[in-house]
Each structure stands twice: as C-alpha cells, then as structure tokens.
C-alpha cells in the first residue's frame, strides 16, 4: 500500500540522480549534501541548498530558543512559537503519523515497533511512546488542524487514552482492535 508519507517525502531520487550525474558523489567527488572547502587556508564546511544546488557555509551555530524546550517534553516543544519548533512539529507530525499508518500492515505490535526503532536507530523513544508523551488526543488534534489525515489506529489510541498503560504492575499495549494486552518480554530482559 502507499502511505501518505510517500507523498510528503517522495523518494528524493531526482535530487540524488542529478547530484550523481553532475559528479556530486561525496568526498571522493565534488561533494555531497555537505562538503569541505578551503578558504584562506582554513577548511570550511559547506551545505548544499536542496532548491538551488548552490553551496554556502554551513551555520553550525544556528540556534533557536525552542532548542531548550526539548527537556520539557515534545508537547511544550511543539507549542513553542519559533521556526525551530515549527520545523520539529512538521517532522514529528509526518513521521509519527506515518508509523501509525503502518499498523497493522507492518506489525500489530506497537511495542515491537518502538523497540525496533530504539534498537535499530538508537532512538530514545519509539514513535508510539512519543505520541503517548505528546498525548494521543492532542496529537490527533494537531494532525487535523494541519490538514493531515489521521490514521484509524491513532484515532483508536486517542479514544483509549494512548498506546500504553500499566495494569496490575504490567505494561499493556494497544492492539488494532482496541483491546489492551500485556507486553511480552523474555524473562531474561531487563529494562530501565
């Protein structure tokens, strides 16, 4: 199936194919998305504009006040009124809703998806854990306000209070049919 994320991101093939055809293949070529250039005897890191293809010095010190909001959680960060927070919000809305669109086609076990993202990509939290930290209902409202589609499974989570809960000392996960089941972990597994 085709998911909305494909429409947003596309494959990027046209940019990449044009770069390869023009010899921009990385360090051994003319550069890539970034390149090191010498100016006045100093090495300067440059970034390629995805719209013009021109290089300009990469601004390593670009900071936004919202960068300090991350410690307060994703919800407060997404609410912060600056360009950095707006960028993060767009990425989170697209990425996390994409993960919810994949259930149950890829897996019906949100815990397995979260674990795979943490182990495979070194994320601190998986996509469904992030949605729970924002609040599933809050996240659904943000998607609606932005004009994005809301996956059915995400609607189920919003109506259920989230993807995870704790009952009788056991972590429970939401299933596509709306029921909660205990998260199964091997006995030898420890989590902190």
What is each of the regions a protein language model found here?
Residues 1-192:
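N-terminal glycine-rich phosphate-binding loop for ADP-containing cofactors
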């Amino acid at each position: 199936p085709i998911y909305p994320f494909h429409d947003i991101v596309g494959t990027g093939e046209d940019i990449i194919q044009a770069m390869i055809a023009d010899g921009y293949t990385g360090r051994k070529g003319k550069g890539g998305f970034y390149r090191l250039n010498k100016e006045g005897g100093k090495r300067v890191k440059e970034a390629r504009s995805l719209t013009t293809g021109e290089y300009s010095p990469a601004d390593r010190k670009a900071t936004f006040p919202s960068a300090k909001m991350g410690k307060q959680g994703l919800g407060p960060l997404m609410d912060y009124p600056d360009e950095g927070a707006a960028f993060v919000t767009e990425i989170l809305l697209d990425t996390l809703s994409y993960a919810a669109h994949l259930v149950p086609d890829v897996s019906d076990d949100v815990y397995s998806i979260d674990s795979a993202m943490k182990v495979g990509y070194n994320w601190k939290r998986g996509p469904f854990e992030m949605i729970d930290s924002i609040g599933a209902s809050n996240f659904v409202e943000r998607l609606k306000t932005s004009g994005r589609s809301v996956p059915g499974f995400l609607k189920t989570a919003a109506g259920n209070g989230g993807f995870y809960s704790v009952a009788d000392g056991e972590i429970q996960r939401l299933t596509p049919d709306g029921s909660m089941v205990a998260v199964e972990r091997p006995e030898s597994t420890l989590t902190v």
